[in-house]
């Protein structure tokens, strides 16, 4: 027996070497080697020489196809004939199974070596399998599908399509075998099948989901990619079989084919309304490109759930909040207030995006929506105001006034948010707010200085014009809130009322001593004479700032350098070196 096994092994090794040298002659070499193996003397009856021959033929076929993948069909056919002629096959040996294994190996190796011809080779192998004696090829076909999915996932779709076309009854089993063997190939496999044999798409996708529930979404996505017209039917069937996966299915379909996402998700939501918000949220998170279309469709079908869906989608993906808000305005404007409040309650960034989209969609209703949002989340007042200013700039001033009236405590945040979003319009917006609510001027001024320092000068000018009596107090509040903006603020308040230049400068310096130099520089922008008076008064009140005042004014207006230096030095002789 040992001698027989050694002889058979030696023969197989020689055959392998010969095939490596001349792949095209693989079948002929196999035939000659089988004759040699048949002539090995003194082989015990219990030794399975037929099995050795079949295994050798399988290995030779695989090796030959790897070397010449274009000849795969011819090699497999010729090798099948050689295997059919193997003598003395025992009843226990599964020659049909060995032939099927050889065929599967050939298909797999060919798919790896030449992906472009994978479908053609798979079709030829299915024909070869059909000629294998015996009627139990189902398991072998499924094994072949699994083997290909593992080794050549990129060709899985094309190969499954060909295999399903050749044997429709096995489509589901082959699809689930592929998905189970390589989950990453589930979507491409279903796409190929759905394109090649559309009528089998739903059945095969369902088979995948039954075998591997976690792949339901990928199966649905495959159908959507390969045959969009069947996407809704497949998604419904899969969600019906596995309700817990509804959101995943909706998201995968939307990601695979955004164009059909709204139609598919709407059909699923109609079948299972309780899961609509979860589906919408999953789409927003995993397929944001389809979020607005899906939201519009779902909300137009069920306006009463618009707020819930909007909130769920914005929470799942804050970056999609603007699109979702736009969908609310288009599909369910009657739910806009509730939806706006629900979205604002999530976080400030969502509130800003939603406010912007809603204000742009309906500027006339922006004030009411902003008020509803601010009531839901007062801490987001600045972001809501900024969003409104972005979305409806022409109505920003009126909306700012109404927001401050609705919540006076938020006046600073509203002013700051508006000014930061639209610095060029800050003057008009802040002026309107100051005129409407004189008692809140200081708060308004503070908000702008802190959140939009670049707009502080324009805002101060507008406030001084709207309420001259409160201008100096407002300027002082702004300087205290943001000393770095003091120069623009001082220039604006003094330009608005030159007669009170000295009073304004000293009041601001008292509120923000560290900004004395900037205040003097601001005064110098308007009137150098006033700047000297203001600088002198500030330095007398705070001699330690003399050097800072001199340097800041000189940097702003070099022509005044000598004069301001002299004045400061005379006020503080001991600090002349510092000056």
Regions found by a protein language model. Name each.
Residues 1-579:
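General marker for long, soluble alpha-helical cores
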């Amino acid at each position: 027996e040992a001698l027989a096994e050694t002889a058979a092994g030696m023969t197989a090794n020689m055959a392998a070497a010969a095939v490596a040298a001349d792949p095209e002659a693989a079948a002929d070499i196999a035939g000659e080697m089988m004759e040699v193996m048949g002539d090995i003397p003194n082989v015990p009856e219990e030794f399975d020489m037929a099995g050795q021959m079949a295994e050798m033929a399988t290995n030779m076929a695989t090796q030959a196809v790897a070397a010449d993948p274009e000849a795969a069909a011819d090699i497999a056919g010729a090798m099948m004939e050689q295997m059919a002629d193997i003598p003395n096959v025992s009843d226990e040996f599964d020659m049909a199974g060995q032939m099927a294994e050889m065929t599967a190996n050939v298909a797999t190796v060919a798919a790896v070596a030449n992906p472009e011809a994978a479908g053609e080779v798979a079709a030829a192998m299915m024909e070869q399998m059909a000629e294998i004696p015996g009627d139990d090829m189902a398991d072998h076909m499924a094994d072949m599908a699994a083997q290909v999915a593992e080794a050549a996932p990129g060709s899985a779709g094309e190969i499954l399509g060909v295999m399903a076309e050749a044997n429709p009854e096995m489509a589901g089993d082959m699809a689930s075998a592929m998905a189970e063997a390589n989950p990453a190939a589930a979507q491409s496999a279903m796409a190929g099948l759905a394109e090649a044999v559309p009528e089998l798409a739903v059945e095969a996708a369902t088979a995948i989901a039954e075998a591997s529930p976690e792949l339901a979404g990928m199966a649905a996505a495959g159908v959507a990619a390969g045959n969009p017209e069947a996407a809704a039917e497949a998604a419904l069937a899969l969600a019906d079989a596995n309700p817990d996966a509804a959101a995943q299915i909706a998201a995968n379909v939307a990601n695979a084919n955004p164009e059909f996402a709204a139609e598919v998700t709407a059909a699923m939501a109609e079948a299972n309304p309780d899961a609509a918000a979860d589906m919408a949220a999953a789409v927003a998170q995993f397929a944001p490109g389809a979020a607005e279309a899906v939201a519009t469709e779902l909300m137009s079908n069920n306006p009463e759930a618009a707020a819930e869906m909007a909130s769920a989608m914005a929470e799942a993906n804050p970056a999609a909040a603007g699109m979702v808000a736009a969908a609310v305005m288009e599909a369910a404007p009657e739910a806009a207030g509730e939806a706006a409040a629900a979205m604002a309650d999530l976080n400030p960034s969502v509130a800003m995006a939603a406010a912007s989209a809603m204000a742009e969609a309906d500027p006339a209703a922006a004030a009411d929506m902003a008020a509803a949002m601010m009531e839901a989340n007062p801490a987001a007042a600045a972001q809501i105001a900024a969003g409104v200013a972005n979305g409806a700039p022409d109505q920003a001033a009126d909306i700012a006034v109404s927001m401050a009236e609705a919540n006076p405590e938020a006046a600073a945040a509203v002013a700051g948010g508006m000014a930061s979003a639209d610095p060029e319009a800050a003057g008009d917006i802040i002026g309107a707010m100051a005129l409407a609510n004189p008692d809140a001027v200081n708060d308004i001024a503070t908000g702008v200085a802190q959140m939009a320092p670049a707009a502080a000068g324009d805002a101060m000018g507008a406030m001084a014009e709207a309420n001259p009596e409160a201008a100096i107090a407002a300027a002082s509040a702004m300087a205290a809130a943001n000393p770095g903006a003091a120069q623009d603020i001082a220039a604006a308040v003094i330009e608005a009322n030159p007669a009170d230049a000295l009073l304004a400068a000293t009041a601001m310096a008292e509120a923000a001593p560290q900004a004395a130099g900037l205040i003097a520089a601001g005064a110098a922008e308007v009137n150098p004479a006033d700047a000297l008076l203001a600088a002198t008064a500030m330095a007398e009140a705070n001699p330690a700032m003399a050097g800072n005042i001199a340097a800041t004014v000189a940097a702003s207006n070099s022509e005044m350098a000598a004069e301001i230096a002299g004045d400061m030095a005379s006020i503080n002789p001991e600090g002349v070196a510092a000056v």
